[in-house]
Amino acid sequence: MEIKSIKKLKLYGFNNLTKTLSFNMYDICYAKTPEHRKAYIEYIDEEYNSERLTNILIEVANIIGANILNIAKQDYDPQGASVTMLISEGKVEQDVENGQGNGNAIGSATDCDNGDGKAGEDCALLIPNAVAAHLDKSHITVHTYPESHPDKGISTFRADIDVSTCGMISPLKALNYLINSFSSDIVIADYRVRGFTRDVSGKKYFIDHKINSIQNYIAKETRELYQMIDVNVYQDNIFHTKMLLKEFDLDNYLFGTAKKELLPGEKKKIKQRLKKEMYEIFSGRNIPKV
């Protein structure tokens, strides 16, 4: 979706506005036995390992038109993964042979693709000046948190994503791609704009585009799938949207067990547990037993 600017601004110097889009994405399931819970954690840990997360972030950089400076990734034991990517708005000139450059960028996002959709070795390249330069650059990060409860049979997977940019590039362009990449049951999205930029007359601008809700930038077909609630603080350029998947098919939430294998009473109890878990995460508070 097009990011509509307030009006055409002639800026004095660099656009110093920092725009940050943050997600907490949740996948919920019911795993009946300890073996099923262990298998779910192993499955989700492999499904969203650091390599796949890296490829998702490379595509995000492509979508928003950013250049990749550096990628750091890590898979954790016993579970979880993290990827951090430093990006910049413009291509940073470098001289690899002499080790010179003003930031030493790897290059555009496409430079990190081997041609098979996977991140190449050059994405791990960190030329000396890059670390010192990153404070005035933008970044994309993702961290995953698989977990399960031994008594209730509920297992959850959470992915935290931050896309922070400065300059003219906007993280909102990657909004729909990120939502679709994780196919989550619950999405908590935050968008904020910080700092200011000036026009040539010296007037400060604290935001440079039109927005009254994150929902403005979510595709119609996605909006139709989710129940959504907004909490926005317009005067502070803070926008918050919660999303809960409308459709509930028990089969989609069972891991290692089919719905037909359960007794009617079991189905009802499991459905109640799952819905309670989802509403608690969606609302951000525990729901007492009635």
Swiss-Prot record:
Pathway: Amine and polyamine biosynthesis; S-adenosylmethioninamine biosynthesis; S-adenosylmethioninamine from S-adenosyl-L-methionine: step 1/1. One of its GO terms (molecular function) is adenosylmethionine decarboxylase activity. One of its GO terms (cellular component) is cytosol. The active site is at S138, H143, C166. Its cofactor is pyruvate. Keywords: Autocatalytic cleavage, Decarboxylase, Lyase, Polyamine biosynthesis, Pyruvate, S-adenosyl-L-methionine, Schiff base, Spermidine biosynthesis, Zymogen. The modification Pyruvic acid (Ser) is found at S138. The record marks K137, S138 as: Cleavage (non-hydrolytic). It is an enzyme of class 4 (lyase). GO terms for biological process: spermidine biosynthetic process. Gene3D superfamilies: S-adenosylmethionine decarboxylase (3.60.90.10). It comes from the Bacteria. Binds 1 pyruvoyl group covalently per subunit. Its EC number is 4.1.1.50. Pfam families: AdoMet_dc. It catalyses: S-adenosyl-L-methionine + H(+) = S-adenosyl 3-(methylsulfanyl)propylamine + CO2. Is synthesized initially as an inactive proenzyme. Formation of the active enzyme involves a self-maturation process in which the active site pyruvoyl group is generated from an internal serine residue via an autocatalytic post-translational modification. Two non-identical subunits are generated from the proenzyme in this reaction, and the pyruvate is formed at the N-terminus of the alpha chain, which is derived from the carboxyl end of the proenzyme. Heterooctamer of four alpha and four beta chains arranged as a tetramer of alpha/beta heterodimers. Catalyzes the decarboxylation of S-adenosylmethionine to S-adenosylmethioninamine (dcAdoMet), the propylamine donor required for the synthesis of the polyamines spermine and spermidine from the diamine putrescine. Belongs to the prokaryotic AdoMetDC family. Type 2 subfamily. This is S-adenosylmethionine decarboxylase proenzyme. The lineage of its organism: Bacteria, Bacillati, Bacillota, Clostridia, Eubacteriales. The gene is speD.
